[in-house]
Amino acid sequence: LVGCHYDSDVMTLEGTIKNVKQVDLYVYAEGSMNPRVDTIRVRGGAFTYERKLTAPEVLTLLYPNFSEMLLVAEPGSEVELVADASNLSETVIKGTKENELLTEFRHATARKSERERRLAAQQFIYDNVQTHAAVAVFREYFVKAENPIYLEAQPLLDTLSLAQPDNELLRAMLVRFTPRLLCAVGQKVPTFEEISLTG
């Protein structure tokens, strides 16, 4: 590694994972303009990953046990991940304000019930509405929910859209999520027409 090397469009993620020597992780940006899946090879409990970016992205780290963790990747940023394979909920991701916000949120909600985490997610989004961290939390707790709740999700979506009108990641997410939201629990059935067999 060359210490003075720096690319303004590259995000560097340095990681250490206790209680594991060799494993492969997968990283991808769901719903972004750059949907490729990369493999991160952890060797000796450590790894380095670089990703070229044109704009901030919310990345998903997929572990071998299929648990997921979100992080915000920004062009030119240097991010550090410190984890323990035996307790991934205590993972620390630091180096940028966005990822430190996500780490604080994860730690604060780790032992809460699903409903309590969802309520905490709503408050986090309102408190940090101009951040990519808020978009990440919205995606995790509302977009990826099996049964999104319209009365909870729609006001958050409206608030995020107003606060971040130029966020391409948010716009792409809206295109995919809005049809699901229109059919969510609590919504009216959309108007439609049907032609019978007899015309």
What are these regions (language model features)?
Residues 4-128:
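A non-transmembrane, solvent-exposed segment enriched in polar/low-complexity residues
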Residues 117-121, 150-160, 188-194:
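Alpha-helical repeat scaffolds
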Residues 127-131, 163-171:
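Short solvent-exposed coil/turn linkers within tandem alpha-helical repeat scaffolds
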Residues 130-141:
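Amphipathic alpha-helical repeat scaffolds of TPR domains
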Residues 142-147:
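Short coil/turn linking the two alpha-helices of tandem helical-hairpin repeats
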Residues 171-199:
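N-terminal "domain-start" segment that seeds a small globular fold
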